[in-house]
Amino acid sequence: MLITERKHFRSGRIAQSMSEANLIDMEAGKLSKSCNITECQDPDLLHNWPDAFTLRGNNASKVANPFWNQLSASNPFLDDITQLRNNRKRNNISILKEDPFLFCREIENGNSFDSSGDELDVHQLLRQTSSRNSGRSKSVSELLDILDDTAHAHQSIHNSDQILLHDLEWLKNDREAYKMAWLSQRQLARSCLDLNTISQSPGWAQTQLAEVTIACKVNHQGGSVQLPESDITVHVPQGHVAVGEFQEVSLRAFLDPPHMLNHDLSCTVSPLLEIMLGNLNTMEALLLEMKIGAEVRKDPFSQVMTEMVCLHSLGKEGPFKVLSNCYIYKDTIQVKLIDLSQVMYLVVAAQAKALPSPAATIWDYIHKTTSIGIYGPKYIHPSFTVVLTVCGHNYMPGQLTISDIKKGGKNISPVVFQLWGKQSFLLDKPQDLSISIFSCDPDFEVKTEGERKEIKQKQLEAGEVVHQQFLFSLVEHREMHLFDFCVQVEPPNGEPVAQFSITTPDPTPNLKRLSNLPGYLQKKEEIKSAPLSPKILVKYPTFQDKTLNFSNYGVTLKAVLRQSKIDYFLEYFKGDTIALLGEGKVKAIGQSKVKEWYVGVLRGKIGLVHCKNVKVISKEQVMFMSDSVFTTRNLLEQIVLPLKKLTYIYSVVLTLVSEKVYDWKVLADVLGYSHLSLEDFDQIQADKESEKVSYVIKKLKEDCHTERNTRKFLYELIVALLKMDCQELVARLIQEAAVLTSAVKLGKGWRELAEKLVRLTKQQMEAYEIPHRGNTGDVAVEMMWKPAYDFLYTWSAHYGNNYRDVLQDLQSALDRMKNPVTKHWRELTGVLILVNSLEVLRVTAFSTSEEV
């Protein structure tokens, strides 16, 4: 017997999540009939908040950044940082004279985004003048779909029996809250998305949702909150909270149930539901209503031996206890939640009291529903993957993150798929199943090795969520179009338990359009899409492994051997001769005090030596050197070591390098991708030099993520850029990473640092924290890096291009704190060694000193 599930529309709004990992659903859906809540779907949000996407700065940068479309979709909340980056030349302006509300003020302008260092007109984004580029830019396809839909308007709902939409009143006047909602969707500090896969498969948006969450604010009149794409609803009765107070309800469902609840006597029949409440000062209980994936069989014995229970826990992994206030009718359960807490986990299970023969498992007493969800990309491509998800309940989210996608025999980073359709069927007992897929269209085929997949009996008994992948491909070079394929589920040597067909979505718009054009028109289209700006020709020098010639040396006046080793500091005996990289000095904290240090080389190691512990001599005065040879390769390998431990913003790195590197082939060769050729770019439709550079960077990112235990993306990229003599670009990247990492290390200590750097007042400090405050009115400890980063970026912007001064002043300020983080975190000291060694590296390693 087949049971076809009805499709639900997704509902939601932008909301501040309770942790960085919480992801918010942002599409429109069902409304509440009980509260005066204003509906605000995403199109309205964009059109009615022009100040949230304000154009500032020089419009010429639109041309400068060909990756704007991707960045504005992934990081629209970085607009204020952009302002600072564009205005860095204002070196003489005191930070104390500026508006402390820099990161939360409203700006009166409109109709554009501002993110990651460049500006873009939204209308220009919608026009998509380049057919090729539009094919690559489907990382913003979800945003384009939203902007295209302008017909929706604000409306107020006063009835009491509709589903509650989010209260957006608090967002309307809080620009930072909107930005923070985006931030909770995108993990800012360490982006590990497979951007190479995204660029090849338009429609797998870079800012996709990893899991569905809904958060609503309900007043004393009550209402209902429904999890999108589900039959899971929490009803808030009238009088639940006092007049003037609000209850914030957040719902999230996990497909994988707790494993300890699945065994012979028990099986879960619903997803694990997380309910988070913002107000525990309540007067009425909540009512949970949800559909479950099983019914007790009608025979008297099953009715006596089996019970459907709702289990409750304060932790995701248990322990769980049975709730008594439950009512079940057919496949629906209602649970009265009396003992409320801020975080609750609930799951429904069928439990048997005993298993007398011939019963073997709980399955013998119930009609168990098994569901299959078919997931794929938003648009189909000449080659794409379909994922079949099998679970023991009827909840299938509209989007699903798959983390074990394979490419070239290797696992790549997680990819988000869209729900194409779902089907449910009854299974009498757990048993081995085989799933087969057949294309109903001769233009498409399923890879032979992937036509049939197996699901084991033990996986069904354990309640596991099973993902099976099927690879489709276009036959030869036929026309792209949507098509049907058939899915069949059958046990060994038995009749199929389920058989149904699925229709794919449309092809990627640019592929569909170009595939329908005659050959000569396609050629014209390619010419029309060619870049207008001339290619910048730069001849990069070749890195040479030469022996360093030191002009200055130092003879140590005493021995320094530390019991507790300190990274980046030299140890030496009295009378040792240390080669000095120059006469410049670095200020940094040592064992306990801030001192001045030379950067030197001793016994093949580069590090700091206290200025007062050495007597500087000339090269002619050197009598004995323990280091006979120290080459530029040795220098490069050591000075970049701190970069392995620095945090970075991937989108910023991608933008800067793509703009400042003008020869993709040189970059590819230095990174070890000399096998890449122009034919590789034909597959991804990369015409501009910057797009090819971006492709190389994304490939490096993907490879480093695959081998993340042994390879570090920022480290390898900086090494390559230094070998190309791109020192200005390297300095910019290093400063960006050092500032962000310092903010993360500081956390709540940023206030003390701000006072030491620029003597901020208490009111000015609070201005930085206001945008990041949670429901309690305070900034969570794990979120303290955000106001710290806002402040440090504002402060560093006033230095312009004086990156050495930024890093040195930051080091000195951190050292002066009561409990300096730099006593344990020495990477900033290592970065100071790096920037003070760049000139020596350039003079020796390159035959020319031209700046790039």
Swiss-Prot record:
Its main location: cytoplasm. One of its GO terms (molecular function) is growth factor activity. Keywords: Activator, Cytoplasm, Growth factor, Mitogen, Nucleus, Phosphoprotein, SH3 domain, Transcription, Transcription regulation. Preferentially expressed in metastasizing tumors. Residues 549-619 form the SH3 domain. GO terms for cellular component: cytoplasm; mitochondrion; nucleus. The keyword Phosphoprotein applies. The modification Phosphoserine is found at S19. Residues 212-349 form the ZU5 domain. Pfam families: DEATH_SH3BP4 (PF24094), SH3BP4_C (PF23637), UPA_SH3BP4 (PF23640). GO terms for biological process: positive regulation of cell division; positive regulation of transcription by RNA polymerase II. InterPro entries: DEATH_SH3BP4, SH3_domain, SH3BP4_C, UPA_SH3BP4, ZU5_dom. It is found in: Cytoplasm; Nucleus. Acts as a transcription activator for MET and as a key regulator of HGF-MET signaling. Promotes cell motility, proliferation and hepatocyte growth factor (HGF)-dependent scattering in vitro and tumor growth and metastasis in vivo. Interacts with FASLG. PANTHER family: METASTASIS-ASSOCIATED IN COLON CANCER PROTEIN 1, SH3 DOMAIN-CONTAINING PROTEIN. This is Metastasis-associated in colon cancer protein 1.
